[in-house]
Amino acid sequence: MISKAFVTTLVATVANAASGVFDYKQNGKDWGHIAGNELCDHGKEQSPIDLTGGTYSNSQEININNLYPDGSTSIAIKDHTVQVTVGSGGFEKVFESGSASDFEALQFHFHAPSENTINGKHMDLEMHIVHKYASTDPAKYGAVLGFMFDMEEGGSGKNNLIEQVSKVFNSGNTSGTTTNGEVWLKGFLDSVDTDRFWSFDGSLTTPPCSEGIKWTVFQQVLPISAEQLAKFTNLWADNANYAGGNGNNREV
């Protein structure tokens, strides 16, 4: 069940890893060699994963509340992804045991191509909304909501949320570029079927690859246009730090 009467205004930046600067030259296969990132190599519940309809189900329940903020937005481009800071709002997740946890949104960001795969196939773009446990201070990462975009599976029409976030590219395409604007999440979430999702325990997909993360990836694949997708992929085209220009996605 989901309540979506909210509008969110956000600050967009590009994320560095929690444990320092990193790159995608080997799609994350070299991260575990750096002190503090050992889980990236030796963890037992690492993400991303391959999602299949028969393996992960909607046996758990989520409830997204209407506490996300609105206001002015500063959007900046830096190193590894477009990241949008939320700062409040969140959702409740009810587990099979009957227990529940409240999660507070921190930020959302993008990977192209997707990190999680569906039946072995990468989607064109994946968005992660990262949350902390609402009861912890300082922040302890606790949950990620994942959304897939693909021109073939979801359609090649323009996506309103992607259009709003990608306004930053109108001001330039280099690290440090900033602009002002608003990003509205209500219309985006209204377009998503939140009754069908995969739910699993995993990790952060960037260093230090912390585990114990409650993942929810919605099964509906959403539309994105070729023009919108290109604005993201152009960030790492011909850049050796992004697997030779092939993307900012971790492979496990």
Task: Locate each region found by the language model.
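Alpha-carbonic anhydrase
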Residues: 2-252
